[in-house]
Amino acid sequence: MKMLKEVCPSPSVIFDLGVRNPFSEIMKQNNYKVYNTGGEDLDDNHEMEIPDDVDLVTGFEILEHLVSPYPLLKNIKANRILLTVPIKLWFAKAYKSETDPLDRHYHEFEPWQFDWLLEKSGWKIIKKEYWKNPSKKFGIRPLLRKFTNRYYAVYAERTKESYTNCYKGELNL
């Protein structure tokens, strides 16, 4: 919430990639108006309609679930984004649910990889933050998590050239 408040103070209008979730409610409680996607597959539907009053598009732990996040990032009609992704850890395998095919990580990025993806899709990174996810469990991996960044947040703005092409409809892939 801290980074969101820094890059887009309330009251503001947020378009959050992903279905309504507990964080959507927290944003509302902090005086943000929040729109969410409706649960559609964002790999297939990367040309979504974003309301004109939106100040910022957010995606919290969403892009790792896409086979290819590039078309979504390239085509999204927004000027500003705030995204978070899990960082690939050398001591843990990527997450996959055995029961829910939508709850699987196709990607866990190293920060430089995510930066390159954003830059290639027409975004200029303005601010970055990292944080840890310590566990109260006992063991080697929980101990390593106390000292290892697990999540990466990026605030970016669309580059001028990319903005012009996106709003002319020239980016569809």
Q: What residue spans do the PLM features occupy?
A:
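A short His-aromatic
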Residues: 61-65
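A conserved beta-strand element that flanks and buttresses the S-adenosyl-L-methionine
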Residues: 58
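Conserved class I S-adenosyl-L-methionine
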Residues: 11-20
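Alpha-helix C-terminal capping/helix-to-coil transition sites in glycosyltransferase folds
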Residues: 10, 52-54
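S-adenosyl-L-methionine-dependent methyltransferase catalytic module, highlighting the catalytic core
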Residues: 2-3, 7, 21-25, 67-173
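Adenosine-cofactor binding site in Rossmann-like domains, unifying the SAM/SAH pocket
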Residues: 26-52
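A short beta-strand-loop structural module common to alpha/beta enzyme folds
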Residues: 18, 35-41, 129-132
